[in-house]
Amino acid sequence: MINVSKLKEGIVIDHIRAGHGYKIFQQLGLDKLDDVVVLMRNVDSTKMGHKDLIKIETHLELNFDVLGLIDPDVTISYIREGVRVNKIKLSPPETVK
């Protein structure tokens, strides 16, 4: 198993259904960032069997509507100084613009 170090600063997008991580990666334009971004696919998960996970080593605004449409079960964790300071559980958006 590959180990990816713990984030000191940034965002973790977790509980992504296996196979949906790359779509989220593309829709959020993470390939255009100059910061470190890690997409892990098919990670073992006791809850989900397998899941995808994205770690972003920077703070940025995320479009929760896009995330909620692609995978409404995603959780977003904000990390500061190595500690999770906020965790958001998404749900599908009410309307799409």
At which residue positions do the language-model features occur?
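A generic local secondary-structure boundary/capping motif
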Residues: 25-28, 64-65, 87-90
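A general structural-boundary detector
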Residues: 11, 53, 89-92
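Helix-adjacent hinge/juxtasegments
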Residues: 53-79
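Generic structural motif
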Residues: 18, 42-44, 59, 79-83
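General detector of N-terminal leader/presequence modules that precede the first folded domain
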Residues: 1-47
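Cys/His-clustered metal-coordination modules, chiefly Zn-binding fingers
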Residues: 72-97
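Auxiliary alpha/beta "docking" domains used to position bulky ligands
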Residues: 50
